[in-house]
Regions:
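Alpha-helical transmembrane segments of multi-pass small-molecule/ion transporters
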Residues: 1-314
Length: 314
């Protein structure tokens, strides 16, 4: 077994387990997360060409789907005759409305999907959330600060993390082709960085949940279940859309359901009841477990296919 396959098989879950068990010391390293993420994205973006980054009709479909699920889920839950219905509705809203994760292109690359389509969507979705997020939450929630301040926060929080590694990768491709070829040859770098990053993200998420002590136990359990259910719904819807449009289940699936939990948690704490952000934290843990399972399944399928080819050629 190669080192790369070993890390795909065991390193991902080991990273998740480490983040849960050692969340206190690892959460201290949380300020490193944006920089580690940008480094990981740099290696991923080195594999695509500038001409591949462009708007596509599916991007608009994804944005509309996201908003419909968010508002539909909110109003469906908001008027249920149960305690804390408004908090649960806010949690559902944000689990659907949350912008796509900047790391989505990395996972898509590991799973063999279209990095270009998802990278384009990360930028487009960020720009759309800058406008629609504060407007929707200003309507349904209790905003802190002006609309322009909220839009600026989302812009500063997301766009540089994507654009800096993207422009750096394209600049090296244009000016330093030899270096670009060397970087491109390091195809497994994203995996190694992701394993390290995953432990930090999980630790930061667990630390956040541990700090939320003001909610009753039943409410916390329901909020965690909301994170799981909305994760499964978007996973299933995204996979189905991807199969229908692209003939494969990876690209659009990841674009719809892999979320930027840090931005979402900030939006909840700025506009809604802060306890609702427990759902988003739980969503982050579930999506990373799903991602690890997907990578392992994809790797094992590739190994089986390679063995089958070798047997046929022999």
């Amino acid at each position: 077994m190669t080192l790369q396959r070993f890390l795909k098989e065991y390193g991902l879950f080991g990273s998740i387990l480490l983040g849960i068990v050692a969340y206190r010391p690892l959460s201290v390293l949380s300020p490193m997360i944006p920089y580690v993420l940008m480094t990981m994205l740099f290696f991923t973006f080195s594999r695509i060409a500038p001409r591949d980054i462009r708007p596509r009709p599916i991007h608009l479909t994804l944005i509309v789907t996201q908003i419909v699920l968010a508002l539909g889920g909110y109003f469906l839950v908001r008027y249920l005759p149960v305690p804390y219905a408004e908090i649960y509705a806010q949690a559902v809203l944000m689990c659907f409305l949350c912008p796509v994760a900047a790391a989505a292109p990395v996972i898509v690359g590991l799973l063999g999907g279209s990095i270009a389509i998802v990278t384009s969507y990360v930028v487009i979705n960020c720009l759309s959330i800058i406008i629609t997020g504060p407007l929707i939450l200003g309507w349904l929630g209790h905003p802190q600060g002006t609309l322009l301040e909220s839009m600026a926060h989302v812009l500063v929080g997301v766009l540089p993390i994507v654009m800096i590694p993207l422009l750096t990768a394209f600049g090296i491709r244009w000016k330093l082709p030899t270096l670009h070829a060397k970087v491109r040859s390091l195809s497994s770098a994203s995996l190694y960085i992701w394993i390290f990053l995953l432990s930090l993200v999980i630790a930061n998420t667990v630390h956040f949940v541990a700090q939320e002590r003001h909610g009753v136990a039943t409410m916390i359990v329901v909020l965690v279940l909301i994170g799981l259910v909305t994760c499964i719904i978007q996973y299933a819807v995204g996979k189905a859309m991807s199969r229908r449009v692209l003939g494969e289940s990876v690209t659009i699936g990841q674009a719809l359901w892999q979320k930027n939990s840090s931005i979402s948690i900030w939006m909840i704490q700025s506009y809604l009841n802060p306890i609702a952000s427990v759902s988003q934290a739980a969503y982050s843990i579930f999506q990373n477990i799903f991602n690890a399972l997907q990578v392992i399944h994809h790797d094992r399928r590739q190994v089986r296919e390679q063995r089958s080819i070798h047997k046929e050629s022999a």
